[in-house]
Amino acid sequence: MSGSPVKRQRMESALDQLKQFTTVVADTGDFNAIDEYKPQDATTNPSLILAAAQMPAYQELVEEAIAYGKKLGGPQEEQIKNAIDKLFVLFGAEILKKIPGRVSTEVDARLSFDKDAMVARARRIIELYKEAGISKDRILIKLSSTWEGIQAGKELEEQHGIHCNMTLLFSFAQAVACAEAGVTLISPFVGRILDWHVANTDKKSYEPQEDPGVKSVTKIYNYYKKFGYKTIVMGASFRNTGEIKALAGCDFLTISPKLLGELLKDSSKLAPTLSVKAAQTSDLEKIHLDEKAFRWLHNEDQMAVEKLSDGIRKFAADAIKLERMLTERMFSAENGK
């Protein structure tokens, strides 16, 4: 009745095939867009939350966050900060109703060079999840992969049992430092690396296997697997499905709803390109990085230096936009009285 097994297999979507060897994660704050793709986990960031917070469907969450900020009181700045943390957690809690795994919630990018402030803010976010009845085991705290961010991740993991997702990761130096810090997961970016090469070199298009972002994640994956690091490698920031397919077999891949939709409609055959076995044969050598060596090696990578600082600025700008939006909603009525 349902056709031959061969025919059925042939019609299997690229998304379903990908799920056989890679954990698929949805990269969105728009949790209504998650259902049909059935991801294991989800990731958010300040830009995605800002976009979702402006959608009519999510105004109740925004109102709830505002009410929470006001209820805690204190100076206006404090109320806004509390409202934003609450908003991130409300979105995370709604997403968790739709997925079996974990959600990633980001610490304010403006704290990217302040280890202690990142640790404190992360603990506050976990506390808010706890108030909402959600265990820290279902949360990944996202931190910028600066030296300070990586050390904050190490402290959160070792001293507080808080799982971290190191983001804005563009260089091999960042990946090595994260592995040595023993964080739960890293998010090496793919598309933003491609963007830099397209903007700064004469080559304007790449085959997926030659894509500089794909090559970066492949090298990081091979290094982690060759030397037995437990940290999960989650490729992030994709510009097209070709990049995703070229990283099939990576531990996790976090993908926007738009590209998840394209993979769902695509029935071409997909085979893993990354594997632990292949990683063992790579010619990578193990290195150790203290702070000085990290800063030097990272600084040697012009693309990574520019994209890390650009990424922090972009997330910070969107955090400021979100603050302004909430400030207007929280205080303009009062000021207008």
Curated annotation (Swiss-Prot):
Quaternary structure, from the entry: Homodimer. Interacts with KPNA1 and KPNA4.
Does the entry feature the keyword Nucleus, yes or no? Answer: yes
Q: In which pathway does it act?
A: Carbohydrate degradation; pentose phosphate pathway; D-glyceraldehyde 3-phosphate and beta-D-fructose 6-phosphate from D-ribose 5-phosphate and D-xylulose 5-phosphate (non-oxidative stage): step 2/3
Q: What is its EC number?
A: 2.2.1.2
- The residues annotated as the active site are K142 (schiff-base intermediate with substrate)
Motif: Nuclear localization signal; annotated at 1-10
List residues modified as Phosphoserine.
S237, S256
Q: What is known of its domains?
A: The first 10 amino acids are essential for nuclear localization.
What broad class of enzyme is this? transferase
Superkingdom assignment: Eukaryota
Ordered alphabetically, the record's keywords are: Acetylation, Cytoplasm, Nucleus, Pentose shunt, Phosphoprotein, Schiff base, Transferase
What is the recorded name of this protein?
A: Transaldolase
Primary site of residence: nucleus
Q: Name one GO molecular function term.
A: transaldolase activity
**Originating organism:** Rattus norvegicus
What's the name of its gene? Taldo1
Entry's Gene Ontology BP terms: carbohydrate metabolic process; fructose 6-phosphate metabolic process; glyceraldehyde-3-phosphate metabolic process; pentose-phosphate shunt; pentose-phosphate shunt, non-oxidative branch
